[in-house]
Amino acid sequence: MNSYIKEKMENNGYKIILIGSSGVGKSSIVHQFLFNRKISNVSPTIGAAFASKQVIAKNGKTLKLNIWDTAGQERFRSITKMYYTNSLGCLVVFDVTDRESFDDVYYWINDLRINCHTTYYILVVANKIDIDKNNWRVSENEIKKFCRDNDCDYVFASSFESDTVNNLFGKMIDKMSEIKINPDSRRNDIIYLSDKSSGIDDFIDKISQNCCYIS
């Protein structure tokens, strides 16, 4: 394993990526989580934006989340794949008022699973629930069925409502807290999932440098 990645994992650095179509509110969700305030008129992400935050899981474990907010525009999709590398958690975001963005969720999940074999937890985020339900283009039953059929969880959220954003990241944080390096393994690059799986050992020794940083 790349020594940089190994060091990050040993220091409880967990890579979380946000994927989804353009305009669904990925950057606004990240901004709400980091700064606890809403933001409007966000410029489209180009490539990816990076931020990190130290958090505490329900089990008391302190984690460092490395959050990658990726571009959703179709012209950047080939670039976005680079940021899948070594992700352990994924938030797949869509806009409840945009049917096409929900239809695209299958593409994003399938693309992730084809190109990344380290992702432990996928959470589908139905965003913009602050908008009147008369304007929703996706029903909860559809979301529930889709996630059941595609083996992932879902949550409703609004980047304007901090409690919903904290809730979705709380779910991710608790899942990430189940992951740890096996100290007894002869291979230092093996990570096992407590009471869940035999482990993740297919890491790619490369991290893309084409990103911007959120301070």
Swiss-Prot record:
Molecular functions per Gene Ontology: GTP binding; GTPase activity
Superkingdom, natural source: Viruses
InterPro entries on file: P-loop_NTPase, Small_GTP-bd, Small_GTPase
Listed GO biological process terms: protein transport
Main localization category: host cell
The keyword Nucleotide-binding is assigned to this record: yes
Protein name: Probable Rab-related GTPase
Organism: Acanthamoeba polyphaga mimivirus (APMV)
